[in-house]
Design a protein with these regions (language model features):
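Hydrophobic N-terminal alpha-helices or hydrophobic patches in metabolic proteins across all domains
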Residues: 1-147
């Protein structure tokens, strides 16, 4: 299956110990009073949202970019969806990669990348878990946060 191309907006990077908040009226990011979960768990990958899904604080799809590149807040990255961390509350976290990366599914991530993802979300409840591209597209199409 050819992966559709989407765009990710970078909202959080390893450089920020506090959770960043996007202000759509100004297009700016500011630090909140809350610590970043990613920073606390030594997670190095950028976090953000899929632009085509909406813009925070309105409904949108969160995503994690599996990359070794450094990005800045607000950067727009051309991506493909390769997997999903399904959550019981339907606030799924899509796993994405740059379109130039030769990878199409969560199963193709390295053991180190999978370990880092598990460090971000170490507790997996009933109905939750890490899944590949096929399940990610099922979630995008069928769950309550679907477009």
């Amino acid at each position: 299956m050819e992966s559709p191309i989407f765009h990710m907006i970078i909202e959080q990077t390893k450089a920020y110990p506090m959770r960043m908040v996007y202000h759509p009226d100004s297009g700016e990011f500011t630090a909140s009073e809350h610590g970043s979960l990613a920073h606390a768990r030594n997670f190095t990958k950028p976090y953000g949202w899929i632009k085509e899904s909406g813009t925070p604080p309105k409904p949108h799809w969160d995503c994690i970019l599996m990359t070794d590149r450094d990005y800045e807040l607000g950067d727009e990255v051309e991506i493909k969806v390769i997997g999903v961390f399904k959550r019981a509350d339907f606030d799924h976290k899509y796993i994405v990669a740059e379109t130039v990366r030769d990878i199409d599914d969560y199963a193709e991530l390295s053991p180190a990348e999978k370990e880092e993802l598990c460090r971000l979300y170490p507790r997996v409840g009933d109905g939750e878990g890490w899944f590949g591209m096929e399940e990610a597209y099922h979630c995008m199409k069928n769950h309550k946060k679907a477009l």
